[in-house]
Amino acid sequence: MEIIIGKTSGFCKGVEHTVREASKILEKEKVYCLGEIVHNERVVTDLKKLGMITINNISDAKNNSKVIVRAHGEVKETYEIAKEKNIELLDLTCGKIKAIKVKIEKHKNDSFIIIIGKKSHPESIGLKSFASNNSCIIENEEDIEKSLDLINKSNLNKIYI
């Protein structure tokens, strides 16, 4: 039996970048990582062997420490708490997610923001935290109906998806 591996299989460019940069950082020093850096147990195990300490909340990091922001990004509050605790965030968020975050911040005051993705996924949660209350995450068809009510209540004339 012949097994063919597609050219596009494997990690996306954002995850490749995050893992590569985290490895470089860990060669020099041990740092925290907020949540699993990527959804790959082998990669997480390898990085822990290099000294990465996974924490679940920015509040778990010591003052004046360094914390990697994983490929999926983080919620807005994380950046605020880090500043208060003098924590240096080593932001390895995927470039595409960073670009979406910038666009959300640009449009949040004059548009209803719709994020399409899993409601429980760190990427969706993080992006929504940068939007105003006039936003929602659509995961399935039911959510489309619910979002229509939210859009109508918002009194906004623009929708940004």
Predicted regions: what is each one?
Residues M1-Y160:
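The feature marks the mature, well-folded catalytic cores of soluble enzymes
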